[in-house]
Amino acid sequence: MRTLWIMAVLLVGVEGSLWQFGKMINYVMGESGVLQYLSYGCYCGLGGQGQPTDATDRCCFVHDCCYGKVTGCDPKIDSYTYSKKNGDVVCGGDDPCKKQICECDRVATTCFRDNKDTYDIKYWFYGAKNCQEKSEPC
């Protein structure tokens, strides 16, 4: 529950990428889609360790890796430009760093949609204690 509260504070208090990522998830997955990914498996939510639990959690693992490769701006707080088109997201803007953040979020959101059948409620609030295996490299 603490993780949910932390994420809620972050999403409400930030008008940057995490806020936009949540809005993007809701657009693609449905109005409350973001709640499903606040604390799921070993990688969805704050932090991440161990092996992804399933294809849905792997989306978050890849997203974490993508954020880790961003240089020159802060993926968690910097705002970017995107538009919505026929259920998809199109990243825009002139700043290459911010566009890279948007692409990380877009790819993850699309991954959630493409793997929604792998989502398993048993991994919601799974907990770090269940994610003790060695992490694979990005």
Swiss-Prot record:
Belongs to the phospholipase A2 family. Group II subfamily. D49 sub-subfamily. Ca(2+) binds at residues 43, 47-48, 64. This is Acidic phospholipase A2 BthA-1. Residues 1-16 form the signal peptide. Disulfide bonds join 42-131, 44-60, 59-111, 65-138, 66-104, 73-97, 91-102. Its main location: secreted. Snake venom phospholipase A2 (PLA2) that displays edema-inducing activities (activity that is inhibited by EDTA and dexamethasone), inhibits phospholipid-dependent collagen/ADP-induced platelet aggregation, possess hypotensive as well as anticoagulant activities. In addition, this enzyme shows bactericidal activity against E.coli and S.aureus. PLA2 catalyzes the calcium-dependent hydrolysis of the 2-acyl groups in 3-sn-phosphoglycerides. Its EC number is 3.1.1.4. GO terms for molecular function: calcium ion binding; calcium-dependent phospholipase A2 activity; phospholipid binding; toxin activity. Binds 1 Ca(2+) ion per subunit.
